[in-house]
Amino acid sequence: MKKEPQSIVFDKYADNYDEGHTQAVKASGFLPSYFHEYKVIELFTYLKSIGKEKEKLLLLNYGCGTGNSEKYLKKYLPNLIICSVDISKESIRVAKEENKDLNDVTFKQFDGLHIPFEFEFDIIFIANVFHHIPRGQQFDSMKAIYNKLKASGFLIMYELNPVNPLTLWVAIQNDYKFDKNSKLLNPLYCRKLLNKSCFKKCMIRFTIFFPGFLSFLKRFEKYLYKLPIGAHYYYIAKKC
């Protein structure tokens, strides 16, 4: 049976995406908002470490879905100019409605490859997107991302870690609507994808080591970032 295009799958569930996501991550003990916000906090922490957290930077949110990251991006990094794209027309509709009060935020539908902006970006933010992209299309997508970065720019790319038992259990048990055709990406594969696309200085960090009922241990997570068993991981990769 031919797989349904992901754009159509996400169109169908755009209005109920948050409900489905809540069910999918229930075993973690956290709400989806926790995961949306933590990713932005990681970006903020990195920008602060290089003294750029207050700069007026151009950010592309590649695969923005229903726009759950934008309010946190503007909360922690209010000077950002945000351009957000997604393959799902209905998800973009929901994202525009949910974020209509935010300034300097633009949403556009795209085909997954041709990024619909003429200018280049300081940051490209990719939150758990690439495991939805068919393997045969991932290199072309990553190369398109590379070509849209300024020479001084970087991407921050988050993925689910298939080595983590809770992540794997959630993926197997939930097999939920918009994720059933995806394939989790191991960190080594992602590094090879980035290197093949000409990215340099790839830095990896592992995150989310404790479920909700052990959240009092969260303060220790910053010391565990090298352990390859976190539920999520992310790469920061530079163009040069």
Where are these regions (language model features)?
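Conserved alpha-helix/loop element of class I SAM-dependent methyltransferases that forms part
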Residues: 35-55, 72
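A conserved beta-strand element that flanks and buttresses the S-adenosyl-L-methionine
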Residues: 125
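Short alpha-helix
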Residues: 183-198
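Class I SAM-dependent methyltransferase SAM/SAH-binding core
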Residues: 60, 66-113
